[in-house]
């Protein structure tokens, strides 16, 4: 994405103005920072253009989303050499083996999304001031507010997938949630609240964002209405509210339903989705690089999963490349919607995910025909031309089994598998015990284990005194 020199200079000024406070975000209840007032930042954030510059900070708003969930999931494995690689810390190894005491001493995967929340809150407060003064175009301000609400809800959702229990309608009012930072004032004390409060805020923010955002955006690093509906669909899916997930996915697809014909891609490329921002991308974001997920010489795709791709399924050759030498017989992941060969994985929102969410909603409602219609629409673009035979299903249960299987194959390394495991484990039809081996020892993770909720980083606990997750 190219920007003018004026943009870059303006962006640098704004970034420097807020940087000094970001390191203390959410790490403490801020007693030692009581002399720093939020106005020290807001004095330099005065116009709608300033707000847009903040939201366009790609390094804060679109990157660094948590990757510990994907690293804890079951779509890959490590050889003993990979497990012992010097690029992995002991904490990374603990995450891989689901060690009960595995806790990050540092807080990067907590602070990074809360940094984005901080930016979003600054924008929300500035927009309200501009509205009260009547000093800016209302349409512009509404879009800025919608964008900030989108980013805040996205971050709350991402944090909740790691550090709050999976949503359950029967216990959400009691289960500890995450701190909901709704102000840029760092003096506000962090409190966890409940899972119900967490998801209520996520849904409220997204519903308002949908009403404010424009249908399209100039670049996919900026939110739009289709992306907000898509994020709402993802949130409802994680809440097991399948009717609302289906409706939200449908609303997103009404605005953008473009799919890539994989027959047009170079199956031999290690970056087949070049250039960046392909037409399926509704909103572009990236996970923080995780050493255990490095596809170059560490992470190998689960062979049971590899074998589910048919010979004429182009995803087998586009998403997977055979390794050589000592790693012959294993496969690396090359299906990243971010055209990079590192572990800088795309975890944004895309059209294919919306087809799968809508299909799952149809299947769970017993509408096998509609579910297979969506699944076939997607898969026709994934198979070699002339080889795909439309799937059929005898009933909703049969359709659901097919949709769930294809969801895992299609959304490989998108940062969604951990959330899917947390959700699907509550259904005995899909519950599974995960198993991994390292240095001759086998490690397991049963369905619904408390370890599906990660321990909050020690640095956060030390500084904020919020309650830790149980073990």
Whereabouts are the PLM-identified features?
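Extended ligand-binding clefts on enzyme/binding-domain cores
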Residues: 44, 239-240, 246-351, 398-418, ...
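Membrane-proximal, proline-rich intrinsically disordered regions
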Residues: 2, 30-78, 305, 389, ...
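Conserved, well-structured interaction surfaces
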Residues: 90-163, 193, 208-215, 342-351, ...
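Short, surface-exposed recognition loops and adjoining beta-strand edges that mediate ligand/DNA contacts
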Residues: 41-45, 70-85, 165-174, 215-292, ...
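Sec-dependent bacterial lipoprotein signal peptides
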Residues: 1-28
């Amino acid at each position: 994405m190219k920007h003018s020199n004026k943009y870059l200079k303006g962006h640098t000024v704004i970034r420097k103005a807020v940087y000094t406070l970001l390191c203390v975000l959410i790490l403490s209840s801020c007693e030692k920072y009581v002399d720093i007032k939020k106005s020290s930042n807001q004095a330099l954030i005065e116009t709608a253009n300033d707000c847009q510059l903040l939201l366009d900070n790609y390094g804060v708003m679109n990157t660094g989303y948590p990757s510990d969930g994907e690293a804890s999931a079951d779509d890959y494995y490590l050889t003993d050499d990979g497990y012992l690689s010097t690029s992995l810390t002991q904490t990374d190894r603990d995450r891989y083996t689901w060690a009960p005491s595995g806790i990050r001493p540092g807080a990067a995967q907590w602070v990074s999304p809360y940094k984005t929340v901080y930016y979003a809150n600054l924008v929300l407060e500035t927009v309200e001031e501009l509205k009260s003064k009547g000093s800016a175009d209302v349409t512009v301000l509404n879009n800025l507010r919608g964008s900030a609400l989108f980013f805040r809800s996205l971050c709350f959702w991402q944090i909740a997938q790691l550090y709050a229990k999976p949503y359950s309608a029967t216990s959400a009012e009691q289960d500890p949630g995450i701190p909901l930072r709704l102000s840029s004032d760092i003096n506000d004390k962090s409190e966890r609240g409940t899972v119900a409060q967490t998801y209520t805020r996520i849904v409220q923010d997204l519903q308002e964002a949908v009403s404010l955002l424009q249908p399209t955006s100039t670049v996919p690093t900026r939110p739009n209405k289709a992306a907000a509906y898509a994020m709402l669909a993802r949130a409802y899916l994680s809440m097991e509210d399948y009717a609302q997930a289906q409706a939200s996915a449908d609303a997103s697809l009404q605005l953008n339903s473009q799919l890539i014909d994989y027959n047009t891609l170079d199956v031999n490329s290690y970056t087949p989705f070049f250039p960046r921002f392909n037409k399926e991308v509704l909103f572009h974001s990236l996970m923080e690089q995780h050493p255990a997920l490095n596809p170059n010489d560490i992470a190998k795709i689960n062979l049971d999963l590899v074998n589910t791709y048919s010979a004429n399924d182009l995803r087998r050759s586009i998403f997977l490349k055979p390794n050589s030498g000592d790693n012959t017989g294993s496969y690396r992941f090359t299906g990243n919607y971010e055209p990079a060969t590192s572990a800088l994985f795309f975890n944004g929102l895309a059209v294919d995910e919306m087809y799968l969410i809508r299909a799952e909603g149809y299947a769970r409602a017993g509408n096998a025909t509609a579910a297979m219609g969506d699944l076939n629409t997607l898969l026709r673009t994934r198979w070699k031309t002339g080889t795909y035979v439309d799937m059929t299903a005898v009933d909703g249960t049969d359709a659901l089994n097919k949709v769930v299987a294809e969801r895992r194959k299609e959304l490989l390394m998108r940062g969604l598998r951990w959330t899917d495991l947390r959700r699907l484990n509550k259904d005995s039809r899909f519950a599974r015990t995960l198993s991994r081996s390292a240095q001759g020892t086998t490690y397991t993770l049963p369905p619904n284990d408390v370890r599906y909720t990660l321990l909050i980083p020690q640095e956060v606990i030390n500084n904020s005194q919020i309650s830790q997750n149980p073990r």
